[in-house]
Amino acid sequence: MSFKMSRKQYADLYGPTTGDSIRLADTQLFAHIERNATVYGDEAVFGGGKSIRDGMGQNSQLTREQGVVDVVITNAIIIDYTGIYKADIGIKDGKISAIGKSGNPSVMDNIDIIIGTSTEVISGERKIVTAGGIDTHVHFISPQQIDTALASGITTLIGGGTGPAEGTKATTITPGSWNLRKMLEAAEAFPINLGFLGKGNSSSLPALEEQIFAGAIGLKIHEDWGATSSAINHSLQIADKYDIQVAIHTDTLNECGFVEETIKAIDNRVIHTYHTEGAGGGHAPDIIKIAALNNILPSSTNPTLPYTVNTLDEHLDMLMVCHHLKANIPEDVMFADSRIRKETIAAEDILQDLGVFSMISSDSQAMGRVGEVIIRNWQTADKMKKQIGSLEGDKEYNDNNRIQRYIAKYTINPAITHGISEYVGSIEVGKYADLVIWDPQFFGVKPDMVLKNGMVVMALMGDENASIPTPQPYYEKKMFGAYGKAVQSSSITFVSKVAYENNIKDKLGLNKVVLPVKNTREISKQDMKLNNATPEIEVDPQTYEVKVDGKVITCEAVDVLPMAQRYFLF
């Protein structure tokens, strides 16, 4: 005999289900649950009087070797580029082993995830689970960035640097084999996935090649070192030879040629264009039009996202500091001014929303904020819904198309671009369990818990001397996965395939999981999930007006945002 209950009763017990919608933080974005992989009446729930008990939802006969998982997240709402749905998530050996229904196969039908004596439970009822974020534009200026990134839901950092040196403060580059070795050694201490870019500014193939053998997962070309056509061509030759990615910050001053010369030098080869909007750097005023090309994998950084009344004012001073410019030198001021164009900044929000720009990253401490990739991603999505309206296919209390487009920008698309999508970037079976758990009202702002390879590394935690975990002060703190040898087993250092094959792990005495990047050269804009539009883009050289397929695009700066002061005292 079946038992009926109201949707509210069900949501209180097990979390929302198929047909329900969840508001994301204080935005106007609503995630609509498309399906439920759990079974009504057989929900796996932990706690006093609940179902995960010996002989009920927990099988105490089967062992770990017989399929029992290490960790299960129960009744979670999954938000991923693959869909928005409800399911249990099984984790074994640090990887996602199954997504579906958990429980005891001895007393329940159609069990995908076996809960046993060896299983730890994380309650996902009324929680949202996303893949860990990937930030591909990181200046490794200070190691403290890593805690800030983790606390925001970022689990992979890709970029370059050696600390607060002038080269690092301006460019995301770890130059040469010695510096790469030192940063790979330093990476051992951090409970986060890391990959380092070598310097691509060279017309010497051997000088570029030695960095790939030293473990660089790619090359970065930056205008401050000279973004010449020769450097572009040589870096891409190395990329094609060793299956690595090239990232580029193009020539703002157009000293080495205009955007057309850069496009010619790239010569239809795939490349990741940083600062495609131009405010952070790149051919003035029309670098933005490069996003129309199918071989370009475009990203933009978070200081210009979303466009607000403060965006223009803060950029000049940031630019002067980050690029070693002097306010008393007129040429330096003119250089800075040439980058900051409200017309292209206003167009950036639109291009992100249309799926023309495929990724969002930080530009950490070098005009961007490492802890705000996720916040600004969703602020932009909310701003666009309010200013433009729902995307095609979305409707009242259902913004799934927009939500899936935007989550892809900081998860799967950066992973595909830099050759790590086999390991991370989405909630799919076989990938490492880099997962972020959110309370819906704090979604995108403050994670409830961050898992690395299935182990909790960061979580909200209260006073350690309290009788329960939640008394104030209640804030993000490192957990056991961030200490001791667990750091090495719960996180990954990415290296080039040739360095991996030459056993760089043993040569440098690395203890972390070391994995090679792969499949970066035979991809295109069409591989960017839900963000693969290639319209014609024009920029007026006098007015900086941006047109997409002949239509002017712009948006208003806003003075109020969600996910902001409501959540932060400072």
From Swiss-Prot:
Swiss-Prot/TrEMBL keywords: Cytoplasm, Hydrolase, Metal-binding, Nickel
Coiled coil regions in record: none
Residues that hold Ni(2+) 2 according to the record: 220, 249, 275
GO biological process, one term: urea catabolic process
Names of the cofactor(s): Ni cation
Residues annotated as signal peptide: none
Cofactor remark: Binds 2 nickel ions per subunit.
InterPro entries (alphabetical): Amidohydro-rel, Metal-dep_hydrolase_composite, Metal_Hydrolase, Urease_alpha_N_dom, Urease_alpha_subunit, Urease_AS, Urease_asu, Urease_asu_c
Source species, domain of life: Bacteria
Enzyme class: hydrolase
Any single GO CC term annotated in Swiss-Prot or TrEMBL for this entry: cytoplasm
Catalytic residues in the record: 323
EC id: 3.5.1.5
Residues binding Ni(2+) 1, per UniProt: 137, 139, 220, 363
All copies of domain Urease, residue ranges: 132-570
N6-carboxylysine modifications at: 220
Pathway assignment: Nitrogen metabolism; urea degradation; CO(2) and NH(3) from urea (urease route): step 1/1
Protein modification: Carboxylation allows a single lysine to coordinate two nickel ions.
Matching Pfam families: Amidohydro_1, Urease_alpha
Family statement: Belongs to the metallo-dependent hydrolases superfamily. Urease alpha subunit family.
Subunit structure: Heterotrimer of UreA (gamma), UreB (beta) and UreC (alpha) subunits. Three heterotrimers associate to form the active enzyme.
NCBIfam families: PRK13206.1, PRK13207.1, urease_alph
PANTHER family linked: UREASE
Entry protein name: Urease subunit alpha
Organism: Bacillus cereus (strain ATCC 10987 / NRS 248)
Gene: ureC
